């Protein structure tokens, strides 16, 4: 655990006021920062000679609106990045809270980490988080005409539309979802001597 403590102290020393919070828990370091410091934090983590987090392993959006089965009191959306230092064999997590819940926007880190390209597109597609200065921010997993963002917690489980092939038109069409919710009542069977004898 000494290396985690050393990493924690180094990160706190390097980032200073740019990090709003540095958390060391369960053998992992998490850096939380505001959107205005996101680019400088990511650049410092990559370029500082003692840190050298040269690889972005993952980036995802998170909707905290009902975190831990309660109504969340803070910002609704965050972008979470997982960084790896191959040189030092260490990992770190960076969480940036998005300022506006209605129109979530954060700066793109594609210029710092090339691997962020498709991850940011996925976060945009699934959560509706916009990434400023992204070179090609468009949907990556859903159709271009898709309405909404399916990983948001307020998105209906069955969606809004379904697609099917129309024989008359000889093409795929969209139509409102025809799934009807049903109530399932469990059937209880009680028999004498059930379970053997």
Curated annotation (Swiss-Prot):
<comment type="similarity">
    <text>Belongs to the complex I 30 kDa subunit family.</text>
</comment>
<dbReference type="InterPro" id="IPR020396">
    <property type="entry name" value="NADH_UbQ_OxRdtase_CS"/>
</dbReference>
<keyword id="KW-0520">NAD</keyword>
<dbReference type="InterPro" id="IPR001268">
    <property type="entry name" value="NADH_UbQ_OxRdtase_30kDa_su"/>
</dbReference>
<dbReference type="GO" id="GO:0048038">
    <property type="term" value="F:quinone binding"/>
</dbReference>
<keyword id="KW-1003">Cell membrane</keyword>
<dbReference type="GO" id="GO:0050136">
    <property type="term" value="F:NADH:ubiquinone reductase (non-electrogenic) activity"/>
</dbReference>
<protein>
    <recommendedName>
        <fullName>NADH-quinone oxidoreductase subunit C</fullName>
        <ecNumber>7.1.1.-</ecNumber>
    </recommendedName>
</protein>
<comment type="function">
    <text>NDH-1 shuttles electrons from NADH, via FMN and iron-sulfur (Fe-S) centers, to quinones in the respiratory chain. The immediate electron acceptor for the enzyme in this species is believed to be ubiquinone. Couples the redox reaction to proton translocation (for every two electrons transferred, four hydrogen ions are translocated across the cytoplasmic membrane), and thus conserves the redox energy in a proton gradient.</text>
</comment>
<dbReference type="InterPro" id="IPR037232">
    <property type="entry name" value="NADH_quin_OxRdtase_su_C/D-like"/>
</dbReference>
<dbReference type="GO" id="GO:0005886">
    <property type="term" value="C:plasma membrane"/>
</dbReference>
<keyword id="KW-0830">Ubiquinone</keyword>
<dbReference type="Pfam" id="PF00329">
    <property type="entry name" value="Complex1_30kDa"/>
</dbReference>
<keyword id="KW-0997">Cell inner membrane</keyword>
<keyword id="KW-0472">Membrane</keyword>
<keyword id="KW-0813">Transport</keyword>
<keyword id="KW-1278">Translocase</keyword>
<comment type="subunit">
    <text>NDH-1 is composed of 14 different subunits. Subunits NuoB, C, D, E, F, and G constitute the peripheral sector of the complex.</text>
</comment>
<dbReference type="GO" id="GO:0008137">
    <property type="term" value="F:NADH dehydrogenase (ubiquinone) activity"/>
</dbReference>
<keyword id="KW-0874">Quinone</keyword>
<dbReference type="InterPro" id="IPR010218">
    <property type="entry name" value="NADH_DH_suC"/>
</dbReference>
């Amino acid at each position: 655990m000494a290396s985690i403590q050393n990493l924690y102290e180094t990160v706190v020393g390097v980032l200073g006021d740019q990090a709003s919070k540095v958390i060391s828990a369960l053998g992992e370091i998490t850096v939380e920062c505001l959107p205005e410091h996101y680019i400088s934090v990511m650049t410092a983590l990559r370029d500082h000679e003692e840190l050298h987090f040269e690889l972005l392993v993952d980036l995802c959006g998170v909707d905290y609106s009902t975190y831990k089965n309660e109504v969340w009191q803070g910002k609704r959306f965050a972008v979470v990045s997982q960084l790896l230092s191959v040189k030092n064999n260490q990992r770190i997590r960076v969480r940036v809270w998005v300022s506006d819940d209605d129109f979530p926007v954060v700066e793109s880190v594609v210029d710092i980490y090339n691997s962020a390209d498709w991850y940011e597109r996925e976060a945009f597609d699934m959560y509706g988080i916009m990434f400023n200065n992204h070179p090609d921010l468009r949907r990556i997993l859903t159709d271009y005409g898709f309405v909404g963002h399916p990983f948001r917690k307020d998105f209906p489980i069955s969606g809004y539309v379904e697609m099917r092939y129309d024989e008359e038109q000889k093409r795929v069409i969209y139509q409102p979802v025809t799934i009807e919710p049903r109530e399932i009542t469990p059937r209880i069977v009680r028999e004498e001597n059930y379970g053997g004898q």
